[in-house]
């Protein structure tokens, strides 16, 4: 999470790939490294637009990286992103098949104030104060204070050594439902996606939303919470067997509502949380809608 956003100077992907190029329709794109900066350009063969890359979002991840561009004081989301699976550039998620009206639109999508709050608010720390962007005080990546709120007030109260000390909320005391909503502030909650009214495979990457739809989901059972399987202070394990003990915490047998699997007791998530390709995302996400998956069944949106 500490690399959810990187400055262009420190982006390993941009450093390791000093020249990237791709075509999309009638437009040609290029990202070139110049010293410790990277320039993003798009041309229609007649006119060329060049923008400096300011930040890389999703930096150095196994999935990909989208770029935040700047021109005339405005920020833009790059129309092309880098994808690990492609080892190169491809249309940014959500822009595939979209026909830009002109060269400027082909370069990137103008970010609204709400876009900036949402993107920087989840990919960085101290990027906003209420509804006010504070990019001058922003710390790239998800740092301690992003989740452990009120740490500054806690530090100040301890240094003063007078009065009642202030302690940050204990996240370990959150119920499963509260934890889903807490993580869902960035990973999307059930309520947020359900209110959009668009149940589709595009929601595969929103884990709290998908988890809530599982038959075994219990808002008060800590064994099905986000942190029961994932330690936010560590990288997510890609080994299926690393989650077996978590599954067996409920499915060891003895309870009718949580029978042991008759097929296997190892690599449970391989069958019950299958990896599904996100269209346009060039990555297979583990579906957190835990279930008995049957061949040929439609995707449970």
Question: Where do the PLM segments sit?
Answer:
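Primarily the internal scaffold of c-type cytochrome electron-transfer domains
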Residues: 1-60, 66-68, 89-104, 126-301
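A short, surface-exposed interaction/processing loop segment used at functional sites
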Residues: 72-111
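Short glycine/proline-enriched loop/turn "hinge" motifs that connect secondary-structure elements
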Residues: 111-114, 219
């Amino acid at each position: 999470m500490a690399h959810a956003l990187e400055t262009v100077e420190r982006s390993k992907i941009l450093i390791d790939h000093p020249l990237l190029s791709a075509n999309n329709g009638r437009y040609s794109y290029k990202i070139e490294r110049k010293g410790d900066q990277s320039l993003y350009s798009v041309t229609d063969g007649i006119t060329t637009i060049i923008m400096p890359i300011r930040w890389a979002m999703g930096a150095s991840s196994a999935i990909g990286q989208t770029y935040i561009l700047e021109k005339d004081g405005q920020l833009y989301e790059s129309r092309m992103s880098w994808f690990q699976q492609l080892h190169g550039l491809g249309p940014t998620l959500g822009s595939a098949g979209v026909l830009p009206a002109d060269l400027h639109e082909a370069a990137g999508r103008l970010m609204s104030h709400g876009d900036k709050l949402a993107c920087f608010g989840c990919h960085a720390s101290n990027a906003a104060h209420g509804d006010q962007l504070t990019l001058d005080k922003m710390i790239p990546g998800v740092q301690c204070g992003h989740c452990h709120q009120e740490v500054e007030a806690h530090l100040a109260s301890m240094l003063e050594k007078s009065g009642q000390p202030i302690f940050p909320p204990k996240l370990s005391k959150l119920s499963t439902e509260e934890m889903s909503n807490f993580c869902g502030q960035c990973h999307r909650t059930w309520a947020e996606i359900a209110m959009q009214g668009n149940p589709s495979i595009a929601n595969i990457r929103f884990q709290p939303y998908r988890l809530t739809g599982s038959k075994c989901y219990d808002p008060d059972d800590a064994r099905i919470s986000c942190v029961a399987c994932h330690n936010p202070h560590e990288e997510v394990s890609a080994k299926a067997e690393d989650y077996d003990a978590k599954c067996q915490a409920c499915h060891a047998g003895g309870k009718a509502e949580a029978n042991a699997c008759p097929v296997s007791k190892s690599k449970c998530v391989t069958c019950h949380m299958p990896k599904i390709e996100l269209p346009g995302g060039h990555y297979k996400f583990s579906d957190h809608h835990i279930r008995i998956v049957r061949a040929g069944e439609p995707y449970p949106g």
